[in-house]
Amino acid sequence: MSHRLDGKVAIVTGGTLGIGLAVADKFVAEGGKVMITGRHADVGEKAAKSIGGPDVIQFFQHDATDEQGWLDLFDATEKAFGPVTTIVNNAGMAVNKSIENTSTKEWKQQLAVNLDGVFYGTRLGIQRMKNKHLGASIINMSSIEGFVGDPNLGAYNASKGGVRIMSKSAAVDCALKDYDVRVNTVHPGYIKTPLVDDLPGAEAAMSARTKTPMGHIGEPNDIAWICVYLASDESKFATGSEFVVDGGYTAQ
């Protein structure tokens, strides 16, 4: 590898599987150090060990909706690896229901994980990384569902659209204040992850492929490499931008 992330220290939420695990793997391969998070310790410890030793990657048990836990996460990461330079707010969930059939509990749960959790990470990231000349980068995982309306993903659409616009606000604020913190969003299309695997039935999987102009769904590494770019100094002039990786889905 080309050591594009030498000297970078990243927090990757939801980093124990799927896109988050791929991001962590590529970050370490490019010279970065990573703290991955998740709710299940056994899964998290195994995931970290699959990538490297504790000198380059560790696991911290954390629910992205736990506001106080974010402070503990930052402290643990900086104790292990030094000043945090990068946050990848990747933890997310979806309930496959229309607005009409979504319960209040399901609505609040998806907004809590997908939007509140990203807000906590973005806010604390700005507070802790600003004015330190770290080339700091906050990468917020949205979705193509932040652009389009899906009849069976009402709450998910709302949460991912919220991530998209909130990130723009944060990016402009940081730029105007010369904080040296960039904020961007990544918008995956259909990617081979547990979230997509949970789509109901073989017909849904076939639909995901046929709706994508390239004729197939993406791989987690397709998203991970975009995140490497955004975490690196190569993207020093990119902020408030939307990086769509969807095989042409939203170009239709």
Feature roles, as predicted:
Residues 9, 16-17, 40:
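Conserved glycine-rich cofactor-binding loop
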Residues 127, 172-176, 236:
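Alpha-helical segment proximal to the catalytic Tyr-Lys
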Residues 98-99, 103-111, 196, 208:
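Substrate-binding pocket helix/loop in short-chain dehydrogenase/reductase
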Residues 180-182, 238-240:
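Short, small/polar-rich loop/turn modules that mediate ligand/substrate recognition or access, typified
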Residues 122, 159, 167:
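Active-site helix of classical SDR
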Residues 2, 148, 214, 227-228, ...:
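Short C-terminal tail/terminal secondary-structure segment
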Residues 143:
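Residue(s) in the substrate-gating loop at a strand-loop-helix junction
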